[in-house]
Amino acid sequence: MNTADFDFHLPEELIAQTPLEKRDASKLLIVNRETGEMQDKHFHSIIDMLEPGDALVMNDTRVLPARLYGQKVETGGHVELLLLKNTSGDEWEVLAKPAKRLKVGTRISFGDGRLSAVVTEELTHGGRIVRFEYQGIFLEVLESLGEMPLPPYIHEKLDDRERYQTVYAKESGSAAAPTAGLHFTKELLAEIQAKGVHLVYLTLHVGLGTFRPVSVDNLDEHEMHSEFYQLSEEAAATLRSVKKNGGRVIAVGTTSIRTLETIGSKFDGQIQADSGWTNIFIKPGYEWKVVDAFSTNFHLPKSTLVMLVSAFAGRELVLDAYHHSIQEHYRFFSFGDAMFIY
């Protein structure tokens, strides 16, 4: 299959620039992958798609305010860093601007001087490894000095940075939100749990590669970015029990899917506690190991995420669903509406 097979025209006005006032007021397109039937609902009605004994699996990663603005200590020149991932200790892989002026040994100061960094390694495509020096707790310093790294297609400033976090965000480390989870409120989750559905949490720290377009025509040549994931023993045991008793594993978002399917692929279809790095590329032809249904937002044309959804429901049905959503003026991408596929 080629990248062009997953293209579609999206009117720019359908790209949501701000979140809705109420998280669960977004639209929900329900798609039956067996019959092709589609239903237009609101997100709160996702509870009607869940049965007692099912497991709803969510990614509890928390987005770092990972964009930092500073000055080179020697020259005062302006520098922008975007934190990508913690490589070890106080060292981070970052995307730097202007990268060509940031050689090994360059020192950068941020804000009131509580945070500084030194470049320790030069990578390709504007990447650098930097070592941070700071007073106090790094994440607290970052919270006060950093800005939210909103996706490149969002041009509005975010009034409340918590709206780019899920209500259950806990484990700091992402450069982008697991946006399928943004629709859930604490009240809706309590209702779902009261129905007898198991709420299960895993962690996958979302990298900026999630926004990177596929640059090759042949999908077999595409290299996926790596992201860190973790599934606890308690969560794995719950999921094994759900499967054993005939319940479904229902993933919230592509990050939960990639974690579960990475583990299923690694352990021959079994669900085990695990942590590590995954670069799994799920595309049509993939044999599913764990996930029985999922919710997800509407994704960019020709993206690996559209390919993942197509691997589950079939390319033609997914593109039909997207065309339907465009006709019905659904909101797209991170702050947009959702679909539920079963």
From Swiss-Prot:
Pfam families: Queuosine_synth. One of its GO terms (cellular component) is cytoplasm. GO terms for molecular function: S-adenosylmethionine:tRNA ribosyltransferase-isomerase activity. GO terms for biological process: queuosine biosynthetic process; tRNA wobble guanine modification. It is found in: Cytoplasm. Its EC number is 2.4.99.17. It comes from the Bacteria. Signal peptide: none annotated. Pathway: tRNA modification; tRNA-queuosine biosynthesis. Keywords: Cytoplasm, Queuosine biosynthesis, S-adenosyl-L-methionine, Transferase. It catalyses: 7-aminomethyl-7-carbaguanosine(34) in tRNA + S-adenosyl-L-methionine = epoxyqueuosine(34) in tRNA + adenine + L-methionine + 2 H(+). SUPFAM superfamilies: QueA-like. InterPro entries: QueA, QueA_dom1, QueA_dom2, QueA_sf. PANTHER family: S-ADENOSYLMETHIONINE:TRNA RIBOSYLTRANSFERASE-ISOMERASE (PTHR30307:SF0). HAMAP family: QueA (MF_00113). Belongs to the QueA family. Monomer. Transfers and isomerizes the ribose moiety from AdoMet to the 7-aminomethyl group of 7-deazaguanine (preQ1-tRNA) to give epoxyqueuosine (oQ-tRNA). This is S-adenosylmethionine:tRNA ribosyltransferase-isomerase.
